[in-house]
Amino acid sequence: MEMKNVKGTKDYLPEEQVLRNKIKRACEDTFERYGCKPLETPTLNMYELMSYKYGGGDEILKEIYTLQDQGKRNLALRYDLTIPFAKVVAMNPNIRLPFKRYEIGKVFRDGPIKQGRFREFIQCDVDIVGVESVMAEAELMSMAFELFRTLNLEVTIQYNNRKLLNGILESINIPTERTSDVILSLDKIEKIGIDGVRKDVLERGISEEMADTICNTVLSCLKLTIADFKEAFNNPLVADGVNELQQLQQYLIALGINENAIFNPFLARGLTMYTGTVYEIFLKDGSITSSIGSGGRYDNIIGAFRGDNMNYPTVGISFGLDVIYTALSQKETISSTADVFIIPLGTELQCLQIAQQLRSTTSLKVELELAGRKLKRALNYANKENIPYVLIIGEDELSTETVVLRNMKEGSEVKVPLSSLKDNTFNNYCNIPIKL
């Protein structure tokens, strides 16, 4: 049997997983700093649930992995974390609102494979239900900038409002039943250009006259400010969208993030579930051209699930861990899983105790040489694993109550008191922050 992975999946070896775990921890820490609560939902769902928001959207539906269980029920692997979250809120009416949750988990899409995009991947999501104000969007965008600062990645966020976009299309007499097709085409404008949009809408069955109107409208809007759209399009949806965008912009200015938040009147986020603000996050350096995060407001999904068709104001943001990993792996040296490597020289019993002492009294990550390798080979291992410090402990060291501390980066050695490993003064001899 040939050993290979399913197309679009990948094994992550320890040196890769270290960085992926760092990203996950950064997400968790940032999300919790904003008062978000953790949630976990099933990977396996009813197909009817997972296909709900994509009704009529064949481009999305064809990417859902489907299967049947032994009871002949139609099931699906979750395509994202948004619908499972909406299901949880709909099933638990006693959840206190506003409810801010985060979830980090695997999702599956049978779509094209490209840089940073696989068919099995991890999303890191935050959603807020119960807040009508675009202050929620501003906070999520602020959180995104904070997360990427933590990861030393410079990003911009493009944003728009679906009310504005839908109002523009309504004002140029695009039939309601064709709006989704046009939006899906406009969503690609930065990738395929205006000529590509024209070709795409024609392929979707839009008439040439309507295609020309769409393209001319796009060109006429490119230099408009947010406020200009009210005058350019006498439409109530446009007016509502402008009002929400202006309020959001005020919050972004107050937060000091408006400079890196860019209004894009044709950003669409193709999914039909969005009802207001939408946004996408991009790397400033363009090393990855696709978005590394996205989201928006969807006020109708939970009410539809609950069957009362009430408005449950909800807004979310999603970060792709895998694409962030790709960006970081291009610029960051993989760090070690251990801070200190202990090499016993005939002192295995004592070193076992010392390793346990350090783990139990400090936050140091400690690895002990277990394979009985000679000193040279053990040091070579520590060097290849990027472990910053090595403790060399032989019988001579124990007799003088000292140990040898080797700085692997500098190649220097110093003798430190054995007592420092027991009284928490070890950090005086190295540059590793120790939490007691």
UniProtKB/Swiss-Prot annotation:
GO biological process, any: histidyl-tRNA aminoacylation
Enzyme class: ligase
Gene Ontology, cellular component aspect: cytoplasm
Keyword Ligase among record annotations: yes
Localization per record: Cytoplasm
InterPro entries: aa-tRNA-synth_II, aa-tRNA-synth_II/BPL/LPL, Anticodon-bd, Anticodon-bd_dom_sf, His-tRNA-ligase, HisRS-like_core, HisRS/HisZ, HisRS_anticodon
Enzyme Commission (EC) number: 6.1.1.21
Example GO molecular function: catalytic activity, acting on a protein
CDD domains for this protein: HisRS-like_core, HisRS_anticodon
Highest taxon listed in the record's lineage: Bacteria
Chief location category: cytoplasm
Catalytic activity: tRNA(His) + L-histidine + ATP = L-histidyl-tRNA(His) + AMP + diphosphate + H(+)
Keywords from the UniProt entry: Aminoacyl-tRNA synthetase, ATP-binding, Cytoplasm, Ligase, Nucleotide-binding, Protein biosynthesis
Subunit composition and interactions: Homodimer.
Family indicated by similarity: Belongs to the class-II aminoacyl-tRNA synthetase family.
Protein's UniProt name: Histidine--tRNA ligase 1
